């Protein structure tokens, strides 16, 4: 019989849908397992090969766990708010909702074609009013706890996009989306007080089964540092400086302030005002990431003022430097060029003194003056001495600082959750009541922003202006919207109870499903989505509305998918199919030599692969199998369409084997042993997420199994059940072909019996006068006489014409003939 995925895959996809095979149930008699993908933004580009790696991995685990008797929750939804749909609306006039719905429909079609086993009954999009009603409600919980507030903030503002951007949305002073110039501005913004949970966020990492690299990234992002605050007196008040190295205080040769520091105007002398103003203007075009990037030179400008050193009382020049950020410490640093590489670059750039106060062993030197004696001290002893001195003289104190800053939450966009707040003229505001949610945005035609710092909602006067019946006052709705991160902060909780109209989730359902047992997604979310979701979850935990302190028990980051790219140097990329190899070199159709590399798949590099084309040619099961076979889940991997073809050939062989007339009711030990060993290897691989080893295990199995004269039916059925998580369509077809009722998952996961895992043969060595002459595979229970006879036969040419004086027999190890 012939294997034709085009005939069987759609059939089984309809069966799963009609039978609701993947519908999750809160069954208290079963152990739960919650396996989740980082849900996608439904872009117009649709599903790409990078999605396939993570989605196939979670699907394999979900299918295996269901077969093993777990109650499995494996859902999918859509992170559907965001800037791309809004920018498309500005260009075309198409409502973002229309674009989003179209893209979601395309994504769903592609996911279905891959045979992923999602519980479709729990599907939602973050842009559904039924969903963001609860996003708004959860925001108000943060607001009521004092964790959401408004403040004037220095932000990255893109005039062309008309909105605030995060550091991650900027590259080299330009927006990632569109490549428009970005500048720094002070704007009134909504902010979430994530810093209030800095310690909990740090401590919680210790309990998580996450990649160490991700945990370290979050630790660095939070950036907890112990040190001291030091006050440097000036004519206009003290400058507070935070330092982690108070032991180097005597080595200070300059102070550097952030351009946004509140004392800059007061400290700038008349002679320096023009150059300082120009420097600050230039700084406004840089993102914070650009400002702190490693560079061989540092920029800065002198204020014309000096501060008094708290110990030596010497005058220290005060500079402005863009590498100093207001968000960390106090927005001022003490420059110690001899013991800080960044300070040294700055000092060399502007010819400032370099004073060494530590020797090579880290012991203080040149650090004594009246009433202050550091020489000879080192490490914590020196730091504590300085802190004690500062505190006793009211010049500073011990302090803990964090790099983490409160989360800028406002966006000047239309396509986002409206913030459910009414403002009044006296500066007060009122959060909307539950019965006023969801707050829907108005239908508009013009999606362009309204002036600096105002989103398109500000233009809809009839929506903005309201008479508040609760306070009997005229008010204005908030016109900022939430960032795309808001909806993804809690979506995993909504999946527990996706269509509850009375609450974001029912307590008993959250208690049953949480935490997420396995969460798979890209490492690029390490310090944004993952940190923000943990923050919201810990707020909810303190509020008593979730039962676990952390949302995601185990995290796995899938590696990048690479593909070969072909580029004409100085001109650009060409399509791979147009490149050809001549005389050991790759050339373009024009004859120009190509730069050939393995790079991340992307549209810009023309090396992307459309999964649907692969499905149409090879079938979804072959694509799924190769997605795992291509390399370890967490490592980068090079994609090869030839590899997909190879997996298709394997599935052809497997289909032929199962449909062969050699499949019979038989208890052949060797066949059963091969099947039990296969199941054991597959089970272990899924448990360890070593999914790339599974195709190899099947290939080894089939190579040995087809050598049998008879294929034991029970062994074949075990192999089909073990293949089902990886290649579900062909497994369903073969399961029925073997005479079983539809639904291979219902048959359970095959049990492995120890007696079939034990090797039934041993290899012994055959020697003549101590020299190796042969190796012999024998049954473990063979008698001494049988072994000696077989050994004599295998070494017969070395024994010919010789008298065997003695045969030394060591069971299961060797036979040595002495002649």
Curated annotation (Swiss-Prot):
EC number: 6.1.1.4
Domain of life: Bacteria
Motif 'KMSKS' region per UniProt: ranges: 600-604
GO molecular function, one term: ATP binding
InterPro entries tied to this protein: aa-tRNA-synth_I_CS, Leu-tRNA-ligase, Leu_tRNA-synth_edit, M/V/L/I-tRNA-synth_anticd-bd, Methionyl/Leucyl_tRNA_Synth, Rossmann-like_a/b/a_fold, tRNAsynth_Ia_anticodon-bd, Val/Leu/Ile-tRNA-synth_edit
Keywords for this protein: Aminoacyl-tRNA synthetase, ATP-binding, Cytoplasm, Ligase, Nucleotide-binding, Protein biosynthesis
Single GO BP term: leucyl-tRNA aminoacylation
Signal sequence annotation: none
UniProt: ATP binding residues: 603
Entry GO terms, CC: cytosol
Catalysed reactions, as listed in the record: tRNA(Leu) + L-leucine + ATP = L-leucyl-tRNA(Leu) + AMP + diphosphate
Motif interval(s): 'HIGH' region: 40-51
Primary location recorded for the protein, binned into one broad class: cytoplasm
Subcellular compartments: Cytoplasm
NCBIfam families in the record: leuS_bact
Family affiliation: Belongs to the class-I aminoacyl-tRNA synthetase family.
PANTHER family in the record: LEUCINE--TRNA LIGASE, MITOCHONDRIAL, LEUCYL-TRNA SYNTHETASE
Listed name of the protein: Leucine--tRNA ligase
Protein source organism: Chlamydia trachomatis serovar L2 (strain ATCC VR-902B / DSM 19102 / 434/Bu)
Gene, per the UniProt record: leuS
């Amino acid at each position: 019989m012939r294997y034709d995925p085009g005939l069987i895959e759609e059939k089984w996809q309809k069966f799963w849908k009609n039978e609701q095979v993947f519908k999750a149930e809160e069954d208290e008699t079963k152990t739960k397992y919650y396996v989740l993908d980082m849900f996608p933004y439904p872009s117009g580009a649709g599903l790409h090969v990078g999605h396939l790696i993570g989605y196939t991995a979670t699907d394999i685990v979900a299918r295996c766990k269901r077969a093993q008797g777990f109650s499995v929750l494996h859902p999918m939804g859509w992170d559907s708010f965001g800037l791309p749909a809004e920018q498309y609306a500005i260009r075309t006039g198409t409502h973002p909702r229309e674009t989003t719905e179209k893209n979601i429909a395309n994504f769903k079609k592609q996911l279905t074609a891959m045979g992923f086993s999602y519980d479709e009954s729990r599907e939602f999009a973050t842009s559904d009013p039924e969903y963001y009603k609860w996003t708004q409600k959860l925001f108000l919980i943060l607001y009521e706890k004092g964790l959401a507030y408004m403040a004037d903030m220095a932000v990255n503002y893109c005039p062309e996009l008309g909105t605030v951007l995060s550091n991650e949305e900027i590259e080299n002073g330009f927006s990632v989306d569109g490549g428009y110039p970005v500048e720094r501005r002070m704007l009134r913004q909504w902010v979430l007080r994530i810093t209030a949970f800095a310690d909990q966020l740090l401590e919680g990492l210790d309990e998580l089964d996450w990649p160490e690299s991700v945990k370290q990234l979050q630790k660095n992002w939070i950036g907890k540092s112990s040190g001291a605050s030091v006050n440097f007196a000036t004519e206009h008040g003290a400058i507070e400086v935070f330092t982690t190295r108070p032991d180097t205080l005597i080595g200070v040769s300059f102070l550097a302030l952030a351009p946004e520091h509140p004392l800059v105007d007061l400290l700038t002398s008349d002679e320096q005002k023009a150059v300082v103003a120009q420097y600050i203007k230039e700084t406004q075009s840089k993102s914070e990431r650009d400002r702190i990037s490693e560079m061989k030179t540092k920029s800065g400008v002198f204020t014309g003022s000096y501060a008094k050193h708290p110990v030596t009382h010497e005058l220290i020049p005060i500079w402005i430097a863009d590498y100093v950020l207001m968000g960390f410490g106090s927005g001022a640093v003490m420059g110690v060029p001899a013991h800080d590489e960044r300070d040294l670059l700055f000092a060399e750039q502007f010819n400032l003194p370099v004073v060494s106060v530590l020797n090579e062993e880290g012991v203080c030197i040149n650090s004594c003056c009246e009433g202050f004696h550091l020489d000879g001290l080192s490490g914590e002893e020196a730091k504590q001495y300085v802190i004690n001195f500062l505190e006793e003289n009211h010049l500073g104190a011990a302090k803990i600082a964090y790099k983490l800053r409160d989360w800028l939450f406002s966006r000047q966009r239309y396509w986002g959750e409206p913030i459910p707040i009414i403002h009044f003229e006296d500066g007060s505001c009122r959060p909307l009541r539950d019965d006023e949610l969801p707050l829907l945005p108005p239908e508009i035609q013009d999606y362009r922003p309204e002036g600096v710092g105002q989103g398109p909602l500000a233009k809809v006067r009839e929506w903005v202006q309201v008479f508040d019946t609760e306070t009997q006052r005229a008010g204005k709705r908030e016109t900022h919207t939430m960032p795309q991160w808001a909806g993804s902060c809690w979506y995993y909780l909504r999946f527990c109870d996706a269509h509850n109209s009375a609450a974001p989730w029912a307590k008993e359902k959250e208690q049953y499903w949480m935490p997420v047992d396995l969460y798979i997604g890209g490492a690029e979310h390490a310090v944004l989505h993952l940190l923000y979701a943990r923050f919201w979850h810990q707020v909810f935990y303190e509020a008593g509305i979730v039962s676990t302190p952390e949302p995601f028990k185990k995290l796995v980051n899938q590696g990048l998918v690479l593909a070969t790219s072909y580029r004409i140097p100085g001109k650009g990329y060409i399509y791979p199919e147009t490149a050809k190899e001549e005389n050991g070199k790759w050339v373009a159709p024009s004859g120009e030599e190509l730069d050939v590399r393995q790079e991340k798949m992307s549209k810009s590099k023309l090396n992307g692969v459309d999964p649907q084309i692969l499905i149409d040619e090879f079938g979804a099961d072959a694509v799924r199998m190769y997605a795992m076979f291509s390399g370890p889940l967490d490592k980068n991997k090079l994609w090869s369409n030839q590899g997909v073809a190879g997996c298709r050939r394997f599935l052809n062989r497997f289909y032929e084997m199962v449909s062969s007339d050699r499949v019979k009711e038989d208890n052949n030990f060797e066949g059963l042993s091969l099947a039990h060993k296969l199941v054991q290897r597959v089970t272990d691989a899924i448990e360890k997420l070593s999914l790339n080893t599974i195709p190899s295990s099947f290939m080894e199995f089939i190579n040995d199994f087809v050598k049998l004269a008879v294929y034991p039916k029970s062994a074949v059925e075990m192999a089909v059940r073990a293949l089902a998580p990886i290649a579900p369509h062909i497994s369903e077809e073969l399961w029925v072909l073997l005479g079983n009722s539809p639904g291979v998952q219902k048959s359970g996961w095959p049990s492995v019996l120890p007696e079939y895992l034990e090797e039934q043969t041993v290899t012994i060595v055959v020697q003549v006068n101590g020299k190796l002459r042969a190796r012999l595979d024998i049954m473990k229970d063979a008698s001494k006489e049988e072994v000696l006879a077989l050994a004599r036969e295998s070494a017969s040419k070395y024994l010919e014409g010789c008298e065997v004086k003695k045969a030394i027999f060591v069971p299961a190890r060797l036979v040595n003939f002495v002649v």
